[in-house]
Amino acid sequence: MSRYVYSLSDYRAIKKAEIALDGLTILAGENGSGKSTLSETLYRLTKVLTEYEQLIDKKATGDIYSAIRPLQKVDMVLQRYVHREQNSDFQIEEILHLVEKIRETKNLISAEEYALKLIEKYRELLTKAFEVTRNKEFLRSRLMTIFETEQEMSDDKSFVENVFSKMEDEIENIAKTARQDKIDRKRKTFVDLMPRIDISNLQLSEDGVELLDQNHFNQLINIKRVIYYKTYELMDYLGDKLSDFYSYLFETSPEYQMTQEERLLPMRLRSILGGTIDRGEILWGEQLLYHRDDGLEIPLNQAATGLISFSYLARLLENGYLKKDTLLIIDEPEAHLHPKWIVEYARILVLLQKQIGTKILISSHNPDMVAAIDAIARKEGVSERTNFYFAKPSDTNKYKYIFERQDNIGSIFDSFNIALTRIEEYGED
C-alpha cells in the first residue's frame, strides 16, 4: 500500500502542514484554522495529477470550439444575404450536427477531426455563396468584419482559401500544443490548471518521490480518482448536474466491478438507511429516490439531511467509485448528524479504509467524531493507519496555524474542553 505525504505552508491561515495520507487522516482545529483550505487544495492538486490528460483535452476542445465561433456569424450573413432557396444546397443540417459534436465532445482527437470537417464544409459553402449571391460586395465586407481582416482580396476564391487555411492552422496548433503538453508535463501548465492557488509551497509525495519539482510534475501511480464534498453543502450536489460529484451519485463507474468484500459495506449502509437509494425519472430529467423498507418512497432531496449523508456514501460505493485507488476527502462529515449517527458514520469510514483500502481525509471539530474514529480504529486494528492532526496557533502569529501530528487525541480534546470552560464561565452567577 502506497504512502503519501501532503505538505503546504505559508498559505492563507496555514503556517505549516505536513500530512500523512496512508489510511484515515483527521484534521482537527478551531474554525478559521485552515482545515477546509487544506482539504480543497489537496482535492484540486490531486484532481490535476489524476486527470491531467483529460483536463488538457477539455481545455483544448474548448479552445477549438472558440476558434470556430466566427463560423456562427457566417451563418447569420448567409441566411440574410443568400437566397433562401439556395440554402438547401449548403447542407445546413450536417453543419449544425458537426458544431454540436464539437461542443459536446471531451476527446481532443474527435474535436480536431470534427472542426476540420466543419471548416471544409464552410469553405464549400462560401465558395458557392459568392457564385450565387446578388450582394457580393456586401458579403465581402461582412466576411472581412467577421474574420477581422483588412486584407485586400485579389479574388473571392483566394479570400475564402486564405481565411480557412488560417483557421485550420489554428485548430491544428491547438491540438499540437495539447499533445505536447501531455508529454512535457511542465510546471507552468500545472500552474495554469490550478488558478488562484499559490503552489510554491505545495508538495505531494508518493512512496518518497516528490511529484512536483522546479520545472515538471510527475504522475500519481496508485491514486486514480479523488472525490471531495462538503457535508454542510449536501443539498447543492443534488442540483449541480455539471459537477463530477453529481455524476458519481447518478452514474455507474466504467470500471465497475465489486468484490464480495466490497459488497459488505453497501449492505451495512442499507441497514442504517432502512431502505435503498435508486434513480428515478422525472419530466425534466432524473432524481434520486429514497425507498424505505416499509414502502415509503420520497425524493432524496426531501429526506432528512442526516439520511442524505449516509446516502451519498452508499451511492459512491454502489456505483463503484470508492476503491483502494480512490482518495476520499470530506469536510465536516458530522454536520447534520445526531450523535448516535456520528458514531455509525465513523464506523463506516474506518471499515471503508480497512476493508476496501480507500484513503480518506476528513476535517472535523466534533469530539464525538474524533473519539469514535479513534476507538473504532483501535478495535478494528487499523490505528497505525489512522492519523490525527491538530491545528495550533503559531507562536509568532495567532492567525497562522501549524498542523501537528498527535500521538493520541488528548490535545484535541483539551481544545474541545474550552467550550465547557466557557459554558461554566458564562453560566456563573
Which residues does each PLM region occupy?
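Switch/communication elements of ASCE P-loop NTPase nucleotide-binding domains
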Residues: M1-E51, Y290-G427
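Phosphate-coordinating catalytic segments in nucleotide- and nucleic-acid-processing enzymes
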Residues: V5-S7, V48-D325, S394-D429
